[in-house]
């Protein structure tokens, strides 16, 4: 194949790698955002449970205790309802990272191939030059005799 074809292929692989890396970063950021929000909601639920226990120990009204308990349960339910989304984003993040790594490896492989090809061509060129120089020297030696 011509060098131009390999250059275009290399550019395409670079673009593909850049896109997949950017996508991986976006998905990872979204996963972190949703996971942190979910952890924050769970933290609030624990805080309300602690407050509920303190209020119960202090003899707060039943209505107030029920309100605090219900709010804590609602927070837990919210956190639990988001768990599938968190897991889906975690999976998407892993897949996007794997794709980015594969694309980077493809690019690295092509670059390695092109470097070896360039070295091989350089060696052939040098070998050809050496042969031409030998021929010139041999011709000079033959003309002197």
Language-model regions, residue ranges each:
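Charge-rich amphipathic alpha-helical interaction elements
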Residues: 1-145
């Amino acid at each position: 194949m011509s060098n131009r074809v390999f250059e275009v292929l290399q550019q395409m692989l670079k673009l593909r790698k850049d896109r997949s890396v950017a996508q991986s970063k976006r998905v990872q950021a979204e996963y972190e955002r949703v996971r942190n929000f979910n952890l924050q909601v769970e933290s609030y639920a624990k805080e309300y449970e602690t407050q509920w226990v303190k209020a119960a120990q202090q003899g707060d009204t039943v209505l107030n205790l029920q309100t605090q308990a219900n709010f804590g349960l609602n927070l837990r339910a919210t956190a639990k309802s988001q768990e599938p989304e968190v897991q889906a984003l975690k999976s998407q993040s892993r897949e996007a990272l794997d794709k980015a790594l594969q694309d980077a490896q493809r690019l690295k492989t092509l670059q390695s191939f092109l470097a070896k090809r360039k070295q091989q061509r350089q060696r052939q060129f040098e070998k050809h030059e050496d042969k031409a120089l030998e021929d010139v020297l041999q011709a000079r030696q033959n003309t002197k005799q």
